[in-house]
């Protein structure tokens, strides 16, 4: 908030309409943004500092896009903070915009995963009844 002058609203788990899935961003910003904060080790933080604006670390793309899907937000500020770094390098903010093509693929993958979970649950119930 101090760096960007954006007020952040805390939020809990947000369920995606019609699915047993959702996300829990670290905060919501205004009507259009959300927030994801990481506090990594120095080496990892340095890698994040090298990312171009608009890019998130590959390992967090699905999480960030999923948060925008769940919240309906247009962008997410990916924030990395490491207090051990020199002043001026402690905070890294990369604004990532919503990618509906990625979210559509994520939707397909989540629905497929939930179908697998449902099938496992049915199989386990049948096994329990047969025992």
Task: Briefly describe each language-model feature range.
Residues 1-131:
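Accessory terminal regions of nucleic-acid processing enzymes
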